[in-house]
Design a protein with these regions (language model features):
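Bacterial N-terminal signal peptides that target proteins for export
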Residues: 1-8
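Cleavable N-terminal signal peptides
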Residues: 9-10, 20
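N-terminal signal peptide c-region/cleavage motif recognized by signal peptidases
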Residues: 15-17
C-alpha cells in the first residue's frame, strides 16, 4: 500500500512537470506555445523527441510560419525554396529567417493522395529542421503534412 501511494505521488508530480515543455539551454526548439495559431489548410510538423504537439505550423500560402525557438513562438519568413512535393520520395528544401534565426528545412514525401481521389488534399512528409540562433544550433527530425 505504501509503495502504491509513493508511486501515485511520483506519477502526479512527474505528470505535472511534463505538461510544460520549453526550450532548454541545450535545445533551441520546443513545441509551439500556441498549438492553434494556424487552423485550416496548413503545414504542420511534430517531433515527439522534442515534446507533445506541433513544432512547426505554417499557412498553406506561406503567409505565416511559426516555430518555438529559444522559448518563444517565432514568426518565420520563407526566403527561398527549391524542389517539389508531388510524389513519394520528392524533396523540398526551404529556408526561413527571423531576427537572428535561420531555419533550413528539408522535406521528403512519404505519402500522397491516391490518384483519382479528388477529395484528398494532403501530402505527408518527414522533415529535418536545422535551426540556428546566434552560436546555438539544433537539428530536429519530425513528421508532418501539408494540405486541408
Amino acid at each position: 500500500m505504501r509503495l502504491i501511494k509513493c508511486s501515485a505521488v511520483v506519477i502526479v508530480l512527474f505528470g505535472a512537470t511534463s505538461l510544460v515543455w520549453s526550450a532548454t539551454p541545450d535545445h533551441l526548439v520546443a513545441p509551439l506555445k500556441d498549438q492553434h495559431a494556424i487552423d485550416g489548410c496548413a503545414w504542420s510538423a511534430s517531433a515527439p523527441t522534442v515534446g507533445p504537439g506541433f513544432v512547426f505550423l505554417g499557412e498553406i500560402d506561406d503567409s505565416r510560419s511559426l516555430m518555438n525557438i529559444g522559448g518563444s513562438d517565432v514568426d518565420l519568413a520563407l526566403t527561398s525554396q527549391h524542389g517539389t512535393l508531388k510524389k513519394v520520395g520528392d524533396v523540398l528544401e526551404r529556408t526561413f529567417k527571423a531576427h537572428g534565426v535561420l531555419v533550413n528545412a528539408k522535406y521528403r514525401v512519404t505519402w500522397t493522395c491516391p490518384k483519382g481521389d479528388d477529395s484528398c488534399e494532403v501530402t505527408r512528409f518527414t522533415v529535418s529542421f536545422n535551426v540556428s540562433k546566434g552560436s546555438k544550433q539544433q537539428t530536429v527530425r519530425a513528421t508532418g503534412d501539408v494540405g486541408c
